[in-house]
A protein has these predicted regions:
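Amphipathic, small/basic residue-rich leader segments at the start of a protein or domain
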Residues: 1-84, 95, 101-105, 109-112, ...
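Glycine-rich beta->alpha junctions and the first turn(s) of the following alpha-helix
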Residues: 6, 190-290, 294
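Short Ser/Thr-interspersed hydrophobic loop/turn segments at strand-loop and sheet-helix junctions
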Residues: 43, 66-74, 165-166, 182-188, ...
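Glycine-rich phosphate/pyrophosphate-binding beta-alpha loops
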Residues: 87, 151-156, 198-199
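A short, Trp-centered hydrophobic/proline-enriched beta-strand micro-motif
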Residues: 113-121, 165
Length: 294
């Protein structure tokens, strides 16, 4: 990584120049993975992140420019869907609490969706009261030995890495005895059991940890400060899910309007409901745009 700092005196010009380079790269390379890797290297993965971490250290509102440009070019952003828990929740938390080695190791393959991530929070006996969790991590000198169970783990069966919160000190108040880890889901002792839904699919999973060894360099944040890291991840989850700014008239309202046109419908009741739905989505879109500039 170069030590040369990018000139951000005119961030919009900078972002547009990077976008031009990215779109030009696509003309000679149709690999999605290579494209997303190039997007990361250009700082267009999360523009507000520091340089070298997939960002340009500019206002997050310019991510809207990036996303809108890619949509108009017909370029896939499915990596954000396939790896929502990593890209939306894990990445900003690792940038805030992680070491440089962790940032360098995890963020790029996370963004390219080569390594899927999951969140390991809920347990059979602790859902809404997260701090009452019982999964234990015991320091054995050169690492931690983890035993316990998690449940409702989205994409756990597809994940390479997990964001895991455990109890490392049972003798202090419950919110102070937690530590956060990045766990390799392919480690010996990790067992993932899919939970079949009525549809036959298995998006959620039970995950069992039996004497799983996690190296100390995989602690995220400070030992005993897992509650703070957990709150950061939950905040990032809300931003990732609720803050996705769509194009005007996209998504379900756009599809319904097109269906209305294709079938030449003329029902005033349905028309009113369509207009109401469109207005609601537009209000959310504009609110998210405003929030991105704060």
């Amino acid at each position: 990584m170069s030590d040369t700092k990018t000139d951000v005196s005119n961030p919009e010009v900078l972002v547009r120049e990077k976008l031009d380079e990215l779109i030009s790269f696509r003309k000679d390379n149709d690999s999605k993975t290579d494209f997303w890797a190039k997007q990361f290297d250009l700082g267009l993965a999360w523009v507000h992140f520091p340089e070298g971490s997939g960002g340009l250290n500019v206002n997050p509102k310019f991510q809207l420019l990036v996303n809108d440009t890619l949509r108009k070019e017909g370029i896939s952003t499915n990596n954000r869907i396939a790896n929502l828990l990593g890209i939306g929740m894990g990445a900003p938390t690792i940038v805030e609490y992680g070491t440089k080695d962790q940032i360098d190791k995890y963020l790029k393959p996370m963004f390219t969706a080569e390594e899927i991530w999951c969140q390991l929070f809920s347990e059979p006996g602790s859902g809404s009261d997260l701090a009452s969790l019982s999964t234990k991590a015991i320091d054995d000198g050169d690492g931690y030995i983890v035993n316990g169970q998690k449940v409702w783990t989205t994409l756990g069966h597809l994940s390479k890495w997990g964001l895991l919160v455990t109890r490392t000190d049972p003798d202090v108040p419950k919110h102070r005895g937690l530590t956060f880890f990045i766990v390799d889901m392919e480690s010996e002792g990790v067992e993932v059991r899919p939970l079949r839904q009525i549809t036959g699919e298995a998006e959620f999973n039970e995950v069992y940890f039996t004497d799983v060894k996690i190296p100390k360099e995989n602690v995220l944040g400070e030992v005993g400060d897992g509650w703070r890291v957990s709150l950061a991840i939950l905040m990032n989850e809300r931003v990732a899910i609720g803050g996705n700014v769509r194009q005007r008239g996209s998504g379900a309202p756009g599809h319904l309007v097109q269906l209305w046109k294709d079938r030449n419908l003329d029902d005033p009741v349905i028309k009113d409901k369509l207009v109401e739905l469109w207005i609601q989505q537009e209000a959310v879109r504009l609110t998210n745009m405003r929030a991105s500039e704060l």
